Amino acid sequence: MSKITRRGFFQHAGIVTAGGIALSGALPGLVSTPARAQPAPDRLALTKALEPELPIIDPLHPALTESTAQAAEQPEPLQPIVFENVLGEYGPWAKKMLGDGPAKLSFLRDEFNRGGIDAWRKKARARLLECLAMPDSGGIPKAQVMHQVEFEGLSIQQLQWQLPYGPPTKAMFLKPANAKGKLPAILALHDHSGKKYFGHSKISRASSDVDPLIKQHVDENYGGVWWANQMARRGYAVLAPDAFLFGSRRIRLSQVPQIMSGLLVEGNPDNALDIVAYNRWARQHEHDVAKSLLCAGTTMPGVVVGEDQRALDYLCSREDVDVSRVGCCGLSSGGLRTLFLAGLDDRIAAACCVGMMTTWRDFCLNKSYTHTWMIYPPGLPRDLDYPEILGLRVPLPTLVQNAEHDQLYTLREMQRADRMLADIYKKAGVESQYQSAFYPGTHRFDLKMQTDAFTWLDSKLAKR
């Protein structure tokens, strides 16, 4: 593969990263026909090609600060040397605004202590909710069972419920066939991956008849395993809902102005080219959705978290679920959804965040171009750093899994976020309730990570 420059990268419409979206140009000529549709780009190859062009450079590195005879011969630059970052010359200014922490409402500040943890949590959660500006998403959803089947030893219900807005939400509920009594439960949260045509089907299935694009996605990101099904086989009741803008909750091309959809039309759901074309369009359209939601007085993360809370409401309302033993888990934006939901809702007795841990500094300076608008509550970074959202659940059990070569974050900031969470739990006197691990490799939730995560969830949620 030839080297891709940054200019070429951003001109390549529809570039995908496993964790979210990349900035891309307009797609006015994209149509879902074999003659004009473009194949999905190799997102890992593109990201790796870009990485050497986006180094994290320390402005205090000796190479930039030491005087040398050669440097003395050079004319003084008109502007000070700026470390390369997303914001260019504005980067140092943005970094200074963020500061080195702790943020205003961080539990790590001296004014907060173990004895006042409940008061601190109440204040910090109130600020988070203010920034999220969550819309009214109704009460406990009234789910309809659309189809029920037994598959590979599991009893599976395909569900549907209607929120106060948008198309019906589809979800899959799984548990062991012939299970009796109340079961521990998992809210299984699917990823983003720039593939909005699909939702919960990226992590759960009810038959062997699977779309080839989903199969490829599961092979690449989950070791070939639909992990929601795996959790159900371990004795859990598992609910996997579609998130806002995904699967059943996606925006239909026929319902937006033609100037936005171009020549694209609703295609054949069995045609891979049509699905890829939609996903490319939807990645670009997410920018417009985020702006429109802000104009409506809400935020994309606020909508997503609110809908996940309604799914949790439904899960906890079921007679076959033990509400004292409910956990949640997800990779990438599923990890993001875990972070927000578990940080806000104490019904989550155990939370596993996979491949979605870093800091606001990392997003701001290094990696915002690789991520979705679902991450950013306006105004929050001065009050809470990103990992501290998950830290709001202290002292409840929390597991964070990271990949050492995750292309969506810098290792330095992943490690800094890990230390931040560990320090929060240590200050609260419950150091053992926080666990984390760094795995070799890139962004994924592979079989080794799944085994470790599921074993940990068993230790927190299984009957004693």
Question: Where are the regions that the model predicts?
Answer:
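Short beta-strand/loop motif that positions the catalytic acidic residue
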Residues: 400-402
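Mobile cap/lid helix-loop segments that gate and shape the active-site cleft of serine hydrolases
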Residues: 283-311, 325, 349-390, 395, ...
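Proline/glycine-enriched tight loop/beta-turn segments at coil->beta junctions
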Residues: 166-168, 177-185
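Cap/lid segment of the alpha/beta-hydrolase catalytic domain
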Residues: 189-306, 363-365
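C-terminal catalytic histidine-bearing segment of alpha/beta-hydrolase fold enzymes
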Residues: 373, 419-420, 424-464
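N-terminal export signals
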Residues: 2, 10-31
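N-terminal targeting or regulatory segments adjacent to alpha/beta-hydrolase or S9 domains
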Residues: 10, 37-155, 163, 199
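Alpha/beta-hydrolase fold nucleophile elbow
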Residues: 321-330
